């Protein structure tokens, strides 16, 4: 605890933070309180990142509220915030920061499935960000936590939902109690789950899957990809920092995805203490 305490920095430094998610916000908060000048840059128009998207899922409104409160807190402190501002090698060269923290998060994995680029296909992140969603029949590819939350989200909007999972069970990464709670909620919705099932092809109004060696067709007005996430590439930013001799820290989902929120926050805090 002693080594993790916030102490005034011996010298104030300009720190460029790439990404306004929960990790970037935590880094900005800790840096400012230590006496540094953090510049928090977010490529989108709002702060909060994955926490805001997660808050759109059923029973997760607290996530969204926590993200908004954290963002409001650093605004009240006086942290310099730049939305609609992605951090690029050119920006790093122009700002000449003393350090850079990369917290640009993750993006959904899009599998190499014929038809995955069709107009009826949407990433889970983008779906949860939409205000108005309507789909008569929806197929969700992936039965992890995000996939099941998306399924419940769509069912709550009146859609008939089928989840396609290649493993022998869904929600594999969850503890037993959370699995039970999620299954109970799903039982009240129009959600069909197909395990040991592989998506073979996506067409304009149907999805071809294979289960037990047999192909079948699933009617689909909407197909949602929810098979996992991977870090948003940041090697160009890291290389720019290395060439300029600027200390660079990669935290949260930008380092490895997916991460627990507490891990991302802890990494951001530790990075802020290291500067």
Please give the residue ranges for each predicted region.
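Residues that recognize and position ribonucleotide moieties
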Residues: 192, 200, 216-218
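Rossmann-like dinucleotide/flavin-binding elements
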Residues: 8-47, 82-96, 103-120, 124-176, ...
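Generic beta-strand structural signal
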Residues: 201-202, 250
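N-terminal Rossmann-like dinucleotide/flavin-binding domain of flavoprotein oxidoreductases
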Residues: 49-97, 172-198, 205
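Short, conserved beta-strand edge motifs with alternating hydrophobic and charged residues
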Residues: 102-103, 194
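Ferredoxin-type iron-sulfur electron-transfer modules in oxidoreductases and energy-metabolism complexes
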Residues: 1-9
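Short, solvent-exposed coil/turn segments at beta-strand boundaries
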Residues: 202-205, 222
